[in-house]
Amino acid sequence: MNHILAIDQGTTSSRAMVFDEALTLKSVAQEEFPQIYPRPGWVEHDPSDLWSSVAATARAAVERAEIDGSLAAIGITNQRETVVVWERASGHPIHNAIVWQDRRTADLCHALAEAGHEPLITGRTGLLLDPYFSATKLKWLLDHVEGARARARRGELLFGTVDSYLIWKLTGGRAHVTDATNAARTMLFDIGRGIWDPEICGLLDIPMEMLPEVKDCAAPFGMTRADLFGREIPILGVAGDQQAATCGQACFRPGMMKSTYGTGCFALLNTGEERVTSRARLLTTIAYQLGGKRTYALEGSIFIAGAVVQWLRDGLKIIREAGETQGLALSSDAAQDLVIVPAFTGLGAPWWKPESRGAVFGLTRNSGPAEFARAALESVGYQTRDLLEAMRADWAAGAEGVLRVDGGMAASDWSMQFLADIIGAPVDRPVVRETTALGVAWLAGMQAGLCPGPEEFAADWALERRFEPQMEASVREAKYDRWGRAVRAVMAV
């Protein structure tokens, strides 16, 4: 028994991958599911869609791998912050899952901030008082579903992030657990003491009876139902998607950084045992927890990364598929200084201006599809530098001089070269791009005794290509200064 199933439950699709004990990918299955938008700014998922897509892809991946019953362990990684509440007795959700993107609790967050509660919340959880996180979404459910809070106090209702709900379903209701990285994203978890915070739960009137047990990222989370895979399989690894990618990128030393480019972008800087309080409105979070020991990180999130390419395709209709952007960027007029600030849903870290909206600067009569494509790709590099500048300002120990990248946009050579140019540092792209699934497969495999510990795993990390800065420093700083003026203009409107 020497294979590991990695379940990767994302925002728009569920994926499952089978790895062998050498962490070589053997099979992949993927299934998309519907997004639900009840009102502007509201985003929901039907929990039954999450479960059915996970169950279907897990079975399909195992079947395609042709591993003849040699599945030894399961790891789960997931979209973070999304909230599910379900009945303990039946397992039925009492409402759709409220997704991390959902902004319905913006007024509540504003009221809590006005009442002076943000220092307490940030000091304990490392997070900003924002609808992005789970706590106010959970309060909204308890406030708006009739009888929910009383039922929760009686122990009839359970709360979980997506990982917790999936473990409940996989184990047939035998395990109500989560891991430290997912707990750290709820805005209810004291990341210094490693416990659910009674004061914050009291402030939001959230019954602590409904909260899951918190475990290490590599730990026994429970055994699956025997009918799912022909026998019971242990769930041995769990981490939120960005923390799993941090492990998959082997960013185990303080100072190591990774940046994942999907719809948005998430950059994490390992700060080791030091819990750094950000002055630049970055998030302080748990990178991973192993053997009861927490390793911390600074995290910055960009709302729009790959989504700016989707806008070129679906909004402006100047490309038919994402792969066309690189060719267009290569053919663009370098003399034009078009700047796109893609604040379609506001500005993320380090600005946190949800009310800001996007803009295009430097438009001329000669600006065409090629210039728009280049400016769109450049915007991702500029935003990444914003995050890295904030991280350097926050942590005196400083980041190492190399950024490891993954995600869909990392496949673009042009984008990665510009990223190296604009941050003025090498950008490393790994051989294995599926770093999120790889990270949680490693966690589960390590707990199962199949995979090595962090040091040996890091030694096996393989570089596919390093992008070295080629842009002259004067050009780099002039371009970044132009970007800064554009962002300030957007925030001033």
Swiss-Prot record:
UniProt keyword annotation of Metal-binding present: no
Alphabetically ordered keywords of this record: ATP-binding, Glycerol metabolism, Kinase, Nucleotide-binding, Transferase
A Pfam short name: FGGY_N
Catalytic activity: glycerol + ATP = sn-glycerol 3-phosphate + ADP + H(+)
Residues bound to glycerol: R80, E81, Y132, D241, Q242
Ligand binding (ADP): T11, R15, T263, G306, G408
Domain of life of the source: Bacteria
Enzyme category, top tier: transferase
GO cellular component: cytosol
One GO biological process term: glycerol metabolic process
CDD domains per record: FGGY_EcGK_like
Record pathway: Polyol metabolism; glycerol degradation via glycerol kinase pathway; sn-glycerol 3-phosphate from glycerol: step 1/1
NCBIfam families noted in UniProt: glycerol_kin, PRK00047.1
Role summary: Key enzyme in the regulation of glycerol uptake and metabolism. Catalyzes the phosphorylation of glycerol to yield sn-glycerol 3-phosphate.
PANTHER family, per the entry: GLYCEROL KINASE, SUGAR KINASE
Similarity comment text for this entry: Belongs to the FGGY kinase family.
The protein's name: Glycerol kinase
Annotated organism of origin: Cereibacter sphaeroides (strain ATCC 17029 / ATH 2.4.9) (Rhodobacter sphaeroides)
Gene name tied to this protein: glpK
